[in-house]
Amino acid sequence: MKKLFVVLVVMPLIYGDNFPCSKLTNRTIGNQWNLIETFLLNYSSRLPPNSDVVLGDYFPTVQPWFNCIRNNSNDLYVTLENLKALYWDYATENITWNHRQRLNVVVNGYPYSITVTTTRNFNSAEGAIICICKGSPPTTTTESSLTCNWGSECRLNHKFPICPSNSEANCGNMLYGLQWFADEVVAYLHGASYRISFENQWSGTVTFGDMRATTLEVAGTLVDLWWFNPVYDVSYYRVNNKNGTTVVSNCTDQCASYVANVFTTQPGGFIPSDFSFNNWFLLTNSSTLVSGKLVTKQPLLVNCLWPVPSFEEAASTFCFEGAGFDQCNGAVLNNTVDVIRFNLNFTTNVQSGKGATVFSLNTTGGVTLEISCYTVSDSSFFSYGEIPFGVTDGPRYCYVHYNGTALKYLGTLPPSVKEIAISKWGHFYINGYNFFSTFPIDCISFNLTTGDSDVFWTIAYTSYTEALVQVENTAITKVTYCNSHVNNIKCSQITANLNNGFYPVSSSEVGLVNKSVVLLPSFYTHTIVNITIGLGMKRSGYGQPIASTLSNITLPMQDHNTDVYCIRSDQFSVYVHSTCKSALWDNIFKRNCTDVLDATAVIKTGTCPFSFDKLNNYLTFNKFCLSLSPVGANCKFDVAARTRTNEQVVRSLYVIYEEGDNIVGVPSDNSGVHDLSVLHLDSCTDYNIYGRTGVGIIRQTNRTLLSGLYYTSLSGDLLGFKNVSDGVIYSVTPCDVSAQAAVIDGTIVGAITSINSELLGLTHWTTTPNFYYYSIYNYTNDRTRGTAIDSNDVDCEPVITYSNIGVCKNGAFVFINVTHSDGDVQPISTGNVTIPTNFTISVQVEYIQVYTTPVSIDCSRYVCNGNPRCNKLLTQYVSACQTIEQALAMGARLENMEVDSMLFVSENALKLASVEAFNSSETLDPIYKEWPNIGGSWLEGLKYILPSHNSKRKYRSAIEDLLFDKVVTSGLGTVDEDYKRCTGGYDIADLVCAQYYNGIMVLPGVANADKMTMYTASLAGGITLGALGGGAVAIPFAVAVQARLNYVALQTDVLNKNQQILASAFNQAIGNITQSFGKVNDAIHQTSRGLATVAKALAKVQDVVNIQGQALSHLTVQLQNNFQAISSSISDIYNRLDELSADAQVDRLITGRLTALNAFVSQTLTRQAEVRASRQLAKDKVNECVRSQSQRFGFCGNGTHLFSLANAAPNGMIFFHTVLLPTAYETVTAWPGICASDGDRTFGLVVKDVQLTLFRNLDDKFYLTPRTMYQPRVATSSDFVQIEGCDVLFVNATVSDLPSIIPDYIDINQTVQDILENFRPNWTVPELTFDIFNATYLNLTGEIDDLEFRSEKLHNTTVELAILIDNINNTLVNLEWLNRIETYVKWPWYVWLLIGLVVIFCIPLLLFCCCSTGCCGCIGCLGSCCHSICSRRQFENYEPIEKVHVH
């Protein structure tokens, strides 16, 4: 709960001006206390039994309550300002349907605001709605508008009944309420409460609208309708829950102090989340944290909280064992009490009680130590000692006493004592600082009294628990227990509020597990080494215990020598025996050690890389000797005497050792012929395998390896081992691997894991090709399990995304696919341009990276590999891991959003994007059937670039298959089956598995190879849709590309011939490039100048794919670096050293590995920034080169752009730019324009089209030609624009003015000169003599032979590539000369003579034919006359004609 202590506000008494109402009533309603009591009983129902607590919060008050009756208008509303909370109630007396009023409450904030809209449907299950959304809410609404349409990104959109149980009879006894804070909103609705945590700014302004009845007349007769209780301040109520009865009453005495210091212990011993932790401090044995957050083990699990108003004069005793918990406030636990905390709230400056104030600590062994402080430094005045609580009136000097003798000076008491905490292990804390440490403590007693001052005590019996603690000014302000799955994530992320997203799941601590040991079978001999330490103790002049340096150490005798003892057996066990004798003032130690002189001998680590108490923990050596002399020793142990007040080093025990496996320290005797190996298979076990220690799961594999005894990864982790007796290979995998938990609104809704077992309390699961997904979403059994995620598709909107993974609010898992679009048809231009005289058609290859593979790193897993002690040390680095993980996650999310917005696929275009569709003649229109398809001689080379449908990989071209087959990854974990395969544990892990084991998880990206292929295929299909106006599948791809070629101004008289030449050259170029892709990869690591664009593109692909894998491999290898620690294995360090010494060594590993992680993150973020720019370039290339024809020279290939095609490539796209490269140029003298004069008038003519150039030819005539191709022609008047004059105006400016005119102007010469002047040396060159010259002979014969071998190999490769280069160079296309110059010339004389003869001959012939033929001609008339003379006239017989009607 957010605010356990309820605040009640006292309002001013005058509100008439703020309530524009028809009628305002300010009076006490009859059932107001019943409403408040019911509200508080409901609120405190979560309190455990046996609770007596004061609640303080912004809760409803007894008065004032306001009733506002308004007229029937929506235009007016009531506004209140500076509110902290608001409560309202609906009266039910004498109310009919017409009497009912609706209400709209608006709480204004930024960026979120709140609206609560109530209708007149009192008996409905959805009669009202609450909205917490971004936006500007309306002040009024309509009865039917139960929606949150006014806002966006709603935190709460919930409909609820107005009356409990949907019955109007239940109305009137429940309050509605709203509380708003900077990080939380609390809503009380229909008896239920809602708490929504988010950051927001609130103005405190509340608006009431729509407070009206059905009619004005009815409204005027009402008295009790909506009643409002605005809250401005804190109020207090006392809730007593005893014997099953809860009593609510007003709090009148020490309410604020009670709220600040007393809480009700929650079930499980938890302190309420809204407790203020007044005067609670973070206990520390070292430096004190001023402000910040950290995860630590602190005594914050409360077994019993005892509120004590005051103490009696007599002394009180508090024991750790058998403490009576009869007066506890709230829940009671029976855990072992670790720390008793005394907390005091004081209201005056000095709170010292009457009489002596002494803390008595009853330590084990019956020795009682007393702690007290004095106003003077002389401890003889101990009888006047005291420990005052509160602000002291001067310095107080504190001592530890025994039987009236000051044993130790502790220091000066803090100026203000607010808390004293004492642990059963002998630590005495004041305000959180470890003031004193002694032997374990049984009981505490003191006679501290509070006198007559206003003091309030609490005594808390607490146990240690892990928690996320927020500290401000050295005091605890907030605690989050690491006691649940979601809280564990909060602790690992060091934040109390989790934003929506994916978070690595912190590995669970491994409890007591079985011990597995693997050793070589052998005949073992065993030696027991008994070391006896005799301590000598005496008192100083002031009575303090002192350990004498005359204390002796006795080793077993060996070869008549007791100074050195060497292990000569295979195994050994070391045991220490300690004795203690005391003396008075001499050095004769005969008496037994009693009281404060009692001491125990301990052997500390000293300078050795292993601890003495870990020698019997299967540590192995080649040689091991103990010595009392430093001669020949490698290191030493410190032998100390531990008393109740301190530790004193008395002697040193020296060690002579060599690392190896011949000697093993064991806990017990195992002599004889044995295979001492003990294996616990298929369960988490603490192992020691041939000296390699750690925690993991051992599984038997089917692998057979001839060589090796054990096998490690590049990071040094143990991956497997061999049983030398039977040759069986066993794998070693971590007990748990990293998982990614999906958190939405502070709740875990799902988790990504490689293990098919329940985790985080999630039971429902589905599987993907890459991992398992567990969720709160119920994947029902009727869906197919163990198959692709498509079988479990859920129609929902993902709230959080990572890579191509999305999770909805209900926990359902979805894949984020490429955006699908219908695609706008972009028609291709059909204009004509001229062609060069000679040029080369070239297909140039360019690779551009589009995306990177997202990587998730579990920082704690990488740094600590699951070691619980290391994880605790890691929390001292505050937000280091959180920063690393969030940087990778945010970078991946940003890139995924950009890539997702870039990739879209047109379904229509995708259907055309295949060789099969383009080659199909069945779908072609008749007008195009005469065109050859791709399989013919038209553009056969396109078949290598265009995608092809197949059963395995759809939409892939031949070149794409070559690219994905030839590019070899190194060190990068794939996302196919590796993640799940690695955790199977039935094979020895490879590098990829080692990465997963160390928390490095490679996730599938938004854009993978198949999606990129679909995208590029859709681009190819889009070209077809746009060809010649575009007609579905009616146009083959060759025609679409040919339309692009036509645009290059091929003249009509040689069009067919030139097209055939271009097609042949293109086919030859593409064919050779395809071959080179298959062969040039072998020459990338050599120095080859052949096939420059192909080699460069493929090399870049190889580099892009491997650069991340190499970075991950380097990051994994860093785990093998010990960073100046004694070992790179954390488990090995803790196995060899005591905890304190091991912490220091592990701290070095943590620092080094965090540095390696920071370097990797910096490299990744830098790489992502580069890829972001590269991705934008790829988008520009797609739009300008693929979807259209570029006019820029050099952007789409190095030449005049014809067309481009894109293919998918690893992590990006590869472009094939078809360009024209001119090989011959015509040099002309260009003219900017013509200056003409006509008498006194002068004007200029300039060329209208900037793409044309005016020049004078050799015949001294002017022509125009395009700048891109030499095509001279005679100019026309339409080519020019007239200007007024021919004068050229210049702007006069100094050099210093140029940057203001040309911002990017830099005078290079001046800049270089300035640099040389600034760095001119001010020294003179010394004169060196070469009288003596020492030369060193360097034998490089082997290196030269190796270079010659590589050179020969390179030569053979380049010979093969030279053939391909020649083939590509043979694509030179010599087109016909298309340049024409229009001129007028005179015909020679013989031409005119020939014309005259033709005319003389033809004219008489034409006249004769015309006059002599036809009916009117001479010949025709003569024939007619002859015919009439020689023959008689005859008449034909005619039949009678009838009239015929034609219908």
From Swiss-Prot:
GO terms for cellular component: host cell endoplasmic reticulum-Golgi intermediate compartment membrane; membrane; viral envelope; virion membrane. It is found in: Virion membrane; Host endoplasmic reticulum-Golgi intermediate compartment membrane. Residues 17-774, 29-774 are annotated as: S1. Residues 775-1447 are annotated as: S2. Residues 1035-1154 are annotated as: Heptad repeat 1 (HR1). It comes from Porcine transmissible gastroenteritis coronavirus (strain Purdue). It comes from the Viruses. It is a single-pass type I membrane protein. Residues 1020-1041 are annotated as: Fusion peptide. S1 region attaches the virion to the cell membrane by interacting with host ANPEP/aminopeptidase N, initiating the infection. Binding to the receptor probably induces conformational changes in the S glycoprotein unmasking the fusion peptide of S2 region and activating membranes fusion. S2 region belongs to the class I viral fusion protein. Under the current model, the protein has at least 3 conformational states: pre-fusion native state, pre-hairpin intermediate state, and post-fusion hairpin state. Keywords: Coiled coil, Glycoprotein, Host membrane, Host-virus interaction, Membrane, Signal, Transmembrane, Transmembrane helix, Viral attachment to host cell, Viral envelope protein, Virion, Virulence, Virus entry into host cell. This is Spike glycoprotein.
